Design a protein with these regions (language model features):
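Ser/Thr-glycine-rich phosphate-binding loops at phosphate-binding pockets of nucleotides
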Residues: 183, 187-188
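Cys-dependent protein tyrosine phosphatase-like superfamily
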Residues: 2-6, 10, 19-178, 190-288
Length: 288
């Protein structure tokens, strides 16, 4: 993968087609899966490469699927072994009300930061990125080549202050922050991609992290099928259509450059201060 530079010096990838060589480009990028009893799509986002030859820090940012079913052993691992102090929950208020309190909610010293990135209407759950028909039409309008990418852009357009709030919560977490939604794919994937880009992780590694969720698709969907809240969304489409596509995240990152001048520009234009941006970058970098 080669990069080209625009006049403003911000990185831009050379096109979605370049991600066909993703596995070769990202040789040596190892996903740090965390095995838990009550969640199946959890990983530490440390040790990812940065553009200046450094790495992201371990035990600073985790991504996950729904944390509702954690066992006592899971809680000990996350809080005592890894040092989680902040849960960044991207689910809707409807989801929170339907699911009830989660095990980490009862742990002293763990802050729950609620940042729903979907409009708070109806029963939006977002297990399947384009499952909601009204939003599906808007998603196709936003980015006809890939409606799921259009759906991701919708988070930025519909709920920018919640997206920014999620990044701010990560930046100022005293210990590790774990970001999650239901499947840990769409909402989580976008917020994590923004955070990693700020930290200087190159686009191909951001895409590799996003696509890694595909390794756990069957387990994620099996888990969600057991939930009354999510089963209808999950059963509405075959598993292959619920897998993350590398091309979708590649397109999203390209659109961030093309439409907004880059991730950092969009964040600062929507209320993330320069101090917050620096805090996020420092927080996620090894050696900080």
């Amino acid at each position: 993968m080669r990069y080209r530079r625009r006049d403003n010096g911000r990185r831009r990838t050379s096109g979605v087609a370049g991600f066909a060589a993703l596995g070769r480009v990202c040789d040596g990028v190892v996903m740090a899966w965390i095995e838990l009893d009550g969640a199946v799509n959890v990983r530490d986002l440390g040790d990812l490469p940065t553009e200046d030859g450094q790495k992201t820090a371990r035990s600073r940012l985790l991504r996950a699927d729904n944390l509702q079913d954690l066992s006592a052993a899971d809680v000990r691992k996350l809080v005592h072994d890894i040092g989680v102090t902040t849960v960044v929950d991207l689910r809707s208020s409807n989801e929170l009300a339907a699911e009830g309190p989660a095990p980490l909610d009862a742990v002293a010293g763990v802050r729950h930061a609620h940042h729903p990135v979907l409009p708070e209407v109806g029963s939006n759950t977002d297990v399947v990125a384009d499952a909601l028909l009204a939003r599906d039409r808007m998603d196709k309008f936003r980015y006809p080549r890939d409606p799921v990418c259009g759906h991701y852009l919708g988070y930025l357009e519909d709920r920018p202050y919640q997206v920014v709030g999620a990044l701010r919560s990560i930046a100022h977490s005293g210990g590790a922050a774990v970001v999650h939604c239901a499947a840990g794919k769409d909402r989580t994937g976008v917020v994590v991609a923004l955070a990693l880009t700020v930290a200087g992780v190159p686009a191909e590694a951001v895409v590799a992290d996003y696509a890694a969720t595909g390794e756990r698709t069957e387990a994620i969907m099996a888990r969600l099928r057991r939930s009354r809240l999510y089963s209808r969304d999950v059963n509405s489409k075959p598993a292959d259509l619920q897998r993350p596509r590398a091309e979708t995240m590649a397109a999203f990152l390209e659109q961030m450059d093309a439409r907004y001048g880059g991730v950092a520009s969009w964040l600062t234009d929507h209320g993330l201060s320069a101090a917050d941006l620096d805090a996020l970058r420092v927080r996620l970098r090894a050696g900080a």
